[in-house]
């Protein structure tokens, strides 16, 4: 889900922290992926430079071409090195025959603790929501108190969905919040209208499901595993069109399977309430919904931001529950097919 469409939800504190293995550091897990991204920058059509305050800037679509593979790798960085993203063929939404498929061994920490775009960064006319493992070092969001997790890493990596380089004031804020030197900050910039931006947004399909489960007050500590997929939409030079398509990919084409502990009835209830179909705003391309609310995200039903189809398996009971469904016709209408 495009980062502008997300919102901070609240839920009761977890009874157990998600970092059951305290030695896990998102910053440490992601470091090899970031190093490889920078090393392969030319092949990935990225531009790497030192920006404001000597922060490392990775341009994945502003002046650089970027591409699908760059977006795939950036999506894995967003997951804090705890997940895998693959581009796989499908016949479900022809001619849009490629899915971003996401899996992670630690869905709560990877998706909510890292990938979720929850850190608001603003200065002057600049605004972006930060996602990625650096959020867990700053831990400015109340979410981290609920997760019982904070990273003590010394290298900060954030992904920003933006078409402009952040000003020095934003770098200063990140450095202060994370207690690091600005030169230890890496900012990966992925415009919504770029190929890399498209992939890394669509690859949030599992995160969107976790975020809604959080909003529905489902106990996050009961979520053991998860996989998800959504179709890769064509980018558009028009921001609103690009933003609408990336949202529609998840709302009408997203598929998520969660594996949970606890009563089978709770799994069934989650499956019923989780799909986008449960929202009052379901049924039109997101661009039309957004325009109908005068381009104000806060007027859109927050329950809309969820995958099209959801399966929840109660692993302690061997029962699975599926709700929602795909809308290939609406996908084609949104994508331009």
Curated annotation (Swiss-Prot):
Broad enzyme group: hydrolase
Superkingdom to which the source organism belongs: Bacteria
InterPro entries (alphabetical): METHMP_CycHdrlase
Record CDD domains: MCH (cd00545)
Residues in the signal sequence: none
Single GO MF descriptor: methenyltetrahydromethanopterin cyclohydrolase activity
EC numbers, comma separated: 3.5.4.27
GO terms of biological process kind: formaldehyde catabolic process; one-carbon metabolic process
Pfam families recorded: MCH
Family: Belongs to the MCH family.
Protein's UniProt name: Methenyltetrahydromethanopterin cyclohydrolase
Source organism (scientific name): Xanthobacter autotrophicus
Taxonomy of the source species: Bacteria, Pseudomonadati, Pseudomonadota, Alphaproteobacteria, Hyphomicrobiales
Gene from which this protein is expressed: mch
